[in-house]
C-alpha cells in the first residue's frame, strides 16, 4: 500500500511541471502615465496599435480616444480588430487610447451641482462636478500631443464615451 502512495505521489508531481510549460501571451496594448499640469494629477492611459501588415511600413492610423477606458478597453480593441479586418466593414484599423478614470463626475460634467439623481438637494451634500472644460483641455493640449509623439497617428481623432462620458462626448461635439 505504501508503494501505491509513493507511485501516486510521483505521478502527481509530474502533472505540475507539465502545466507550467511556457504559455504564449496575448498582447493588446501598453500602459502609460502622464502628469497633467492642467488637472494637477497623474493620469493613466493604455494604447493599442494595430499590427502592421507586410508592405505597410510607416502607415499612420486614426486614433480612437476611449473614455472609461479601464472598463471598455478590451472589448473596444476586439471590436475594432474584428470590424477592421472584415471585408464587409468600412471601419479602418485604428489606434485605441483608453483614458482611465480618476474622478468621473468632476471630469465629465460641465456644471457643478449638489443635486442627487432624483433632483433633491440635502443640506450636507457637497457640490460636485463641473470640470469638463479642464478635462477637455487635458485631452487636447496634453494627452493628444503625448499620444501623437508615441504612435503613428494620421490626424483623424474619435472620442467615445457613455453615461457621463457620453455627456462629455456630446458636449465636446456641440462645442
Where do the PLM segments sit?
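Conserved acidic catalytic loop of the alpha/beta-hydrolase fold
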Residues: 137-155
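Gly/Ala-rich beta-loop-alpha elbow adjacent to hydrolase catalytic centers
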Residues: 160-165, 169
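Conserved hydrolase catalytic core segment
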Residues: 171-175
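Bacterial Sec-dependent N-terminal signal peptides
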Residues: 1-24
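Loop/turn elements at helix/coil->beta-strand transitions in domains of secreted/extracellular proteins
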Residues: 60-62, 91-95, 154-156
Amino acid at each position: 500500500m505504501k508503494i501505491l502512495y509513493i507511485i501516486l505521489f510521483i505521478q502527481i508531481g509530474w502533472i505540475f511541471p507539465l502545466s507550467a510549460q511556457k504559455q504564449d501571451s496575448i498582447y493588446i496594448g501598453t500602459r502609460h502615465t502622464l502628469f497633467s499640469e492642467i488637472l494637477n494629477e497623474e493620469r493613466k492611459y493604455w494604447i493599442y496599435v494595430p499590427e502592421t501588415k507586410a508592405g505597410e511600413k510607416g502607415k499612420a492610423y486614426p486614433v480612437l480616444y476611449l473614455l472609461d477606458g479601464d472598463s471598455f478597453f478590451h472589448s473596444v480593441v476586439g471590436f475594432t480588430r474584428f470590424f477592421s479586418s472584415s471585408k464587409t466593414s468600412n471601419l479602418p484599423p485604428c489606434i485605441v487610447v483608453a483614458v482611465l478614470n480618476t474622478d468621473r463626475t468632476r471630469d465629465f460634467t460641465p456644471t457643478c451641482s449638489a443635486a442627487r439623481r432624483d433632483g433633491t438637494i440635502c443640506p450636507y451634500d457637497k457640490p460636485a462636478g463641473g470640470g469638463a472644460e479642464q478635462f477637455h483641455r487635458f485631452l487636447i493640449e496634453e494627452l493628444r500631443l503625448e499620444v501623437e509623439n508615441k504612435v503613428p497617428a494620421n490626424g483623424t481623432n474619435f472620442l467615445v464615451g457613455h453615461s457621463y462620458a457620453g455627456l462629455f462626448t456630446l458636449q465636446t461635439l456641440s462645442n
